[in-house]
Amino acid sequence: HMSVGLLAHVDAGKTTLAESILYLTGSIRKPGRVDHQDAFLDTYDLERERGITIFSKQAEVKVGEKEVALLDTPGHVDFSAEMERTLQILDYAVLVISGADGVQGHVQTLWRLLTRYEIPVFLFINKMDQEGTDRQKLLEELQKRLDERCIAFEEEQEAFYENLAMSDEAVLEKYLSDGTVE
């Protein structure tokens, strides 16, 4: 069993991602939408009315044979204390970033908190279909403003392994010795 938290700056699409995960894992029959006020994890009237997550919520999902507690946290700065309480129990975090907005100040704050709590982080870049987004520029911004070890999951597996190996000394040694990172 593992605990995975979803964190984001406001309007990055975190709740929409949570709905998609719940739907694709078979936990819900139909994904809700923030603008339709029927998101599964936004259970309080005020959350539905304002279209924001105010309280952290948990949903249990099954991914393969693994049981996962998915924790949806508030993205609005006013509810940061609620989000931060959740960090103490996370095994992993997914930091959702709007590709259209780039690395916002609150994203940097979330990154520092996740680093302080030593929580491994997967970045999920959302809204890349919006006009003006540039994948390479965003990756460079992530590396400059968050961590130089941020890498993209490449479609080409070899390129991904090379980038991954460059982010950690032990992984690099393994990759150089036998061509794998596992």
Listing of model-derived features with the role each one plays in the protein:
Residues 1-97, 103, 144-146, 150-152:
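P-loop NTPase switch module centered on the Walker A-proximal segment
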